[in-house]
């Protein structure tokens, strides 16, 4: 079977976490999510993190920390979760074709966590509780 590797990225700026929402043309999913994307041929997972973050929100990141993986049968994907820190200016440049919203939330003001069985939901909840990998 074919499996598509992809990344889920929790970008932090101190005690803030960047959350996004997909553009209506890109997905019917309306809850907050993390930056995500598929790995391209010849690309490492770490390179995918840097490329997807730059493409979707225009940020440079550093200090990548692998969290865990999760198979996602709906799309035939293997999701790899990473935490990373913003590198420099945290100003967002939004890719409006893919995202409708990207905004920073303080740890104590994060919106309701999406489905906790998803890697995204688990990673957001870990950040909320201060349990993300340092």
Q: What do the PLM-derived regions correspond to, one by one?
A:
Residues 1-34, 38-39, 60-61, 84-86:
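N-terminal strand-loop-strand
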Residues 22-23, 69-71:
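An acidic- and aromatic-residue-enriched active-site/binding cleft used to recognize and process polar
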Residues 70-93:
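Active-site-adjacent beta-strand/loop module that shapes the phosphate/pyrophosphate-binding cleft
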Residues 45, 78, 119:
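Catalytic-loop motifs flanking and including active-site residues across diverse enzymes
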Residues 34-68, 82:
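The catalytic Nudix box helix
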């Amino acid at each position: 079977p074919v499996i598509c590797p992809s990344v889920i990225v929790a970008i932090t700026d101190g005690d803030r976490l960047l959350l996004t929402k997909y553009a209506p043309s890109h997905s019917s999913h309306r809850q907050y999510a993390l930056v995500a994307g598929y790995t391209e041929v010849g690309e490492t997972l770490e390179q995918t993190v840097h490329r997807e973050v730059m493409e979707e929100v225009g940020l440079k990141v550093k200090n990548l920390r692998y969290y865990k993986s999760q198979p996602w049968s709906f799309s035939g994907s293997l999701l790899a979760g990473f935490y990373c820190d913003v590198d420099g200016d945290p100003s967002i440049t939004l890719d409006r074709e893919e995202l409708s919203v990207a905004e920073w939330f303080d740890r104590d003001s994060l919106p309701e966590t999406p489905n906790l069985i998803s890697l995204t939901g688990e990673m957001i909840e870990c950040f909320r509780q201060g349990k993300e990998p340092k």
